[in-house]
Amino acid sequence: MSDNTPWFEGIRFPMVCFSPEILREVRDKFLVKDEDTITVTYPKSGTNWLNEIVCLILSKGDPKLVQSVPNWDRSPWIEFTGGYELVKGQKDPRVYTSHLPLHLFPKSFFSSKAKVIYCIRNPRDALVSGYFFLSKMNVTEKPETLQQYMEWFLQGNVIYGSWFEHVRGWLSMREMENVLVLSYEDLIKDTRSTVEKICQFLGKKLKPEETDLVLKYSSFQFMKENEMSNFTLLPHAYTTEGFTLLRKGTVGDWKNHFTVAQAEAFDKIYQEKMAGYPPKLFSWEEC
């Protein structure tokens, strides 16, 4: 991969909407407030779905906000140059998003009571989703083949760095009372129970009919048709023809794309990198 994208502290970032100065300020100077709710993921791990769910929980299922405000405005990415300004201007309680690895996250979070919801996904599916997503985006060098992107991914030479380091970093926080770790697979398998778990974590009591509305308006089909959620409002300069954010929304799609050799090579590195974690910690081991 050619070096035409910005780097900060050893991590590659997209070519647009980022600067080392803002990333440094976010880490060192941004003040996280106790009332903040922050959704955090490695890219292509259910970020926008989780954001939709959280926004709908906070509105008790009322879809007005998610149908009238683009997702990057209602839950801005704090590390984006524009998103950072939006977060600073938000009224309390603030809701925002990040893909940042733990060591680049705002330092003030670690002495706050702010709530972080971290969603993990089978890295094989995150890889395949990332490949198709970045193949149609003008924010970093486009992979020519899945094999090429897999090599970049396993080397950590992709935007936001290594999946393994990202997940290991955030999993180290999983016993903290203000951090909730979820999996994309659980969201797919039992959406209602996972939504209820998020409600409990956020201290929000929803009536059954309100939970029904959250499930309805955060469903794949509703989000796919909602221009405030499906990224069709992105400037055309950022995307190429055929771009889609919500491609499949399924579990195990990697099996349709990995060769046997690729699956074996990935598994070898996965076992090395994730040694020491109990398999039951990861829902995809059961899928």
From Swiss-Prot:
SUPFAM superfamilies found in the cross-reference section:
P-loop containing nucleoside triphosphate hydrolases
Quote the catalytic activity from the record.
an alcohol + 3'-phosphoadenylyl sulfate = an alkyl sulfate + adenosine 3',5'-bisphosphate + H(+)
Q: In which tissues is it expressed?
A: Adrenal gland and liver.
| Residues at the catalytic site | 99 (proton acceptor)
Question: What biological processes does GO assign it?
Answer: steroid metabolic process
Is the keyword Ribonucleoprotein in the record?
no
Provide a GO CC annotation, any one: cytoplasm
Q: Does the keyword Lipid metabolism apply?
A: yes
Localization recorded for this chain is: Cytoplasm
> Where are the annotated coiled coils located?
none
One MF term in the entry's GO annotations: alcohol sulfotransferase activity
Which domain of life does the UniProt lineage start with? Eukaryota
Broad class of enzyme this protein falls into: transferase
Binding residue positions for 3'-phosphoadenylyl sulfate: 44-49, 121, 129, 184, 218-223, 247-249
Physiological role: Sulfotransferase that utilizes 3'-phospho-5'-adenylyl sulfate (PAPS) as sulfonate donor to catalyze the sulfonation of 3-alpha-hydroxyl groups of neutral steroids.
Q: Which family does it belong to?
A: Belongs to the sulfotransferase 1 family.
Q: How does it assemble?
A: Homodimer.
Name of the protein in its database record = 3-alpha-hydroxysteroid sulfotransferase
Q: Source species, please? A: Cavia porcellus (Guinea pig)
Record gene name:
STD1
